[in-house]
Swiss-Prot record:
Name used for this protein in its record: Prenyl transferase
Gene: preA
Organism: Pyropia yezoensis
Gene Ontology cellular-component annotations: chloroplast
Cofactor binding summary note: Binds 2 Mg(2+) ions per subunit.
Alphabetical GO biological process terms: isoprenoid biosynthetic process; photosynthesis; quinone biosynthetic process
Function of the protein: Possible role in synthesis of the nonaprenyl side chain of plastoquinone or in synthesis of other prenyl chains such as undekaprenyl pyrophosphate.
């Protein structure tokens, strides 16, 4: 299901400007890095993260304005996210993302590593110029969290003993941390009080977890065409996600497939079938819905406004997409 344009209507103009600015970020004196970075941003994406920054910025402003610091924060958030995808694709040996070739597949691994590093460096430079130490600290911690999440994931490849709690914690580091910190950062740049800042951090955290669980479900249920990558790609790389973890108690034969690391040509298809048969997808959806409800509860103290309504609609969209 596509992201509805109406969800981001209150910040449509800001998102258009963001697209232009992201292309400018790729403007470097090194042609090959320029080509790699431009390829990434041209691939598009839902731009959920910067949209959330803009919506939170308007939701916490009496005049529903977005200041310069918040515009920079939205750009930084998307740059960091994009940089992390480049490195993730190298580690997971993905050949496509969003239906186009990954950077290391189009160029080579060396260029992809440098492109990811370049984007992280650019984000750090823009972040330093926001001139709000609390926001700088919060977003800087996210980059550390990315590394923490990747290490945790790497240590449990093809490990069926991983708990749901450990899965959630890893998902926080890899996905939710950035969304949580950027939502809080947008509110902080409006001078919001501690309670509002904390509520929006938790909103972003629960939204991020719901999105990650949703992506993990879609990795099982989606098609190569809709995903822009092969179904079961996470499993192929040894990343055992919630639908499979929930299925292990019902389908003992999954352990044999995991033990041989899905090496046979039919193993992934068999695994997807067993996950669907066992009810693992339903349980994963229920877990995502719990996160969605937790996110909604974090918005209850914000004054009603069009941006707040969009935040709620975006939250409900996750439930709709998982239905």
């Amino acid at each position: 299901m596509a992201m509805s344009p109406s969800l981001f209507y209150p910040v449509e103009q800001e998102l258009c400007s963001l697209e232009k600015n992201l292309k400018a970020v790729a403007g470097t004196r090194h042609p090959i890095l320029y080509a790699a970075a431009k390829h990434l941003f041209d691939a598009g994406g839902k731009r959920v993260r910067p949209a959330l920054v803009f919506l939170v910025a308007k939701a916490t402003s009496e005049k529903q304005d977005i200041n310069t610091g918040q515009k920079r924060l939205a750009e930084i958030t998307e740059i960091i996210h994009t940089a992390s995808l480049v490195h993730d694709d190298i580690i997971d040996e993905c050949t496509t993302r969003r239906g186009v070739k990954t950077v290391h597949n189009l160029f080579n691994t060396k260029i992809a590593v440098l492109a990811g590093d370049f984007l992280f460096a650019q984000s750090s430079w823009y972040l330093a110029n926001i001139e709000n130490l609390a926001v700088v600290k919060a977003i800087s911690k996210v980059i550390t969290d990315f590394a923490e999440g990747e290490i945790r994931q790497g240590l449990v490849h093809f490990d069926p003993s991983i708990s749901i709690d450990a899965y959630i914690e890893k998902s926080f580091y890899k996905t939710a941390s950035l969304i949580a910190a950027s939502c809080r950062g947008a509110a902080m740049l409006n001078g919001s009080n501690h309670q509002i800042n904390n509520d929006l951090y938790l909103y972003g955290k629960h939204m991020g977890l719901a999105f990650q669980i949703m992506d993990d479900v879609l990795d099982i249920t989606g098609s190569t065409k809709s995903l822009g990558k092969p179904a079961g790609a996470d499993l192929i790389n040894g990343n055992l996600t919630s639908p499979l973890l929930f299925s292990l108690t019902q389908e003992a034969s999954l352990n044999d497939l995991i033990d041989r690391e899905f090496c046979n040509s039919t193993d992934i298809a068999s695994t997807l079938f067993l996950i669907k048969r066992s009810g693992g997808i339903t349980k994963a959806k229920d877990l995502a819905k719990e996160q969605v409800q937790a996110a909604l509860s974090c918005l209850q103290f914000l004054p009603q406004s069009t941006p707040v309504s969009s935040l709620k609609e975006l939250t409900h969209f996750i439930i709709t997409r998982l239905s």
